[in-house]
């Protein structure tokens, strides 16, 4: 029986890999023309998702590319007050290692036989066991798995739910080769995560394996059209940097120096999420995983849940190789409970980050005693 996976993200690839380990064939259809067609974003904090990599037989290879130093953390308030600094010993266990998303995706891609991923196949629709692609091609399937992200087309076969704006808008910037170009800022950020949490505004800087620091400047309790009203001239990087600094009155100059030093690519991103606890009636022949099933605020759960979705669906299919309906039912029962709890936690964390006491709330989270 034919298993079609739409989307070569982490969840879809984890599913394909676990199926391969169990001797089950699947095809992954990806709209991008090649694996390197688009940047894959920054670092991921992989914790619960390590179970998926173990089931995929890739945990040792994952540890080889993960960064234990990425577990370092610094938490500050906008006036410069340091609330928390945790530096990871070199021999510390890799409980929550950081890994470049691109490296993790490459690890999964390289673990699959040639031809499993079909590049340049943009899914359009499905009916009566037939997939239709934007290039006019088609393919048959017995089970269709939507691993096609936040704006999933496969999701429309199961539910009318759509992502909604969460009140958070993010400006993403980065500083390339920071150790050479800005060694003072590199030392300040450290080896892992650097958070400055204010009243409705946060700055999250993250060291990447390629020598850059990625920075997300979040504005909470803001409308979906906030970018248009913000006065940030995205087509003029120098003016955009100046405007962003102007949106941080009273912040320690060390923090605004990160914005002043950033590269010219200044990218706005509105944060959306699916309803917490979204479910749908189990439908033979189709299911979802990852952001397609449970898009949630970006606080460290999404990639882990996607990896687990892929691995656990793969295990369910291996347990019921001749009964896809039973496999999907078992998978969805577990997935709804697990990801519903993760989505609620993520929404609560986002609410905490949006509060006037965000920094102290985060300190209490990491140091509850």
Where would I find each of the regions flagged by the language model?
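Short strand-connecting beta-turns/loops that link adjacent beta-strands
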Residues: 78-80, 128, 208-211, 322
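Short helix-loop capping/hinge motifs at secondary-structure junctions, enriched
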Residues: 60, 177-185, 224, 254, ...
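Short, surface-exposed charged micro-motifs
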Residues: 43, 204
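Conserved N-terminal helical subregion
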Residues: 2-3, 18-22, 45-178, 224-226, ...
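C-terminal domain-closing interface element
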Residues: 349-369
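A short acidic, helix-capping loop that chelates divalent metal ions and anchors anionic groups
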Residues: 35-39, 93-94, 224-227, 298
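FAD/FMN-dependent oxidoreductases across multiple families
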Residues: 187, 191, 198-201, 207-213, ...
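Conserved mid-domain beta->alpha element of the FAD-binding
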Residues: 5-33, 145-146, 171, 242-244, ...
């Amino acid at each position: 029986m034919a298993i079609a996976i739409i989307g070569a993200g982490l969840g879809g690839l984890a599913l394909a890999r676990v199926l391969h380990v169990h001797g089950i064939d699947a095809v992954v259809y990806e709209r991008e023309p090649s694996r390197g067609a688009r940047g894959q974003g920054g670092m991921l904090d992989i914790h619960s998702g390590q179970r998926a990599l173990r089931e995929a037989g890739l945990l040792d290879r994952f540890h080889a590319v993960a960064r234990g130093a990425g577990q370092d953390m610094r938490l500050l308030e906008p006036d410069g007050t340091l609330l928390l600094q945790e530096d990871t010993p070199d021999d510390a266990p890799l409980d929550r290692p950081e890994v470049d998303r691109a490296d993790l995706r490459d690890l999964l891609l390289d673990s699959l036989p040639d031809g499993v991923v079909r590049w340049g196949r943009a899914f359009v629709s499905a009916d009566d066991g037939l997939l239709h692609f934007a290039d006019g091609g088609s393919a048959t399937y017995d089970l269709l798995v939507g691993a096609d992200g936040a704006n999933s087309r496969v999701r429309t076969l199961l539910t009318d739910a759509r992502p909604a704006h969460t009140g958070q808008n993010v400006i993403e910037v980065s500083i390339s080769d920071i150790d050479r170009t800005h060694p003072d800022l590199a030392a300040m950020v450290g080896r892992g995560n650097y958070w400055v949490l204010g009243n409705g505004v946060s700055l999250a800087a993250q060291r990447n394996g390629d020598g850059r620091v990625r920075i997300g400047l979040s504005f909470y309790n803001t409308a979906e059209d906030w970018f248009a009203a913000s006065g940030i001239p995205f087509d003029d990087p120098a003016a955009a940097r100046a405007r962003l600094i102007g949106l941080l009155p009273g912040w320690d100059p060390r923090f605004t120096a990160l914005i002043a030093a950033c590269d010219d690519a200044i990218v706005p991103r509105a944060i959306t999420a699916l309803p917490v606890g979204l479910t749908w009636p189990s439908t033979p022949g189709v299911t979802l995983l990852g952001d397609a099933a449970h898009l949630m605020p970006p606080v460290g759960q999404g990639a882990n849940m996607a990896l687990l979705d892929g691995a656990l669906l793969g295990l369910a299919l291996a347990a019921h190789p001749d009964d896809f309906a039973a496999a999907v039912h078992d998978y969805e029962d577990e997935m709804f409970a697990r990801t519903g709890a993760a989505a609620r936690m993520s929404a609560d964390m986002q609410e905490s980050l949006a509060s006037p006491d965000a920094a102290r709330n985060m300190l209490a989270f990491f140091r509850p005693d």
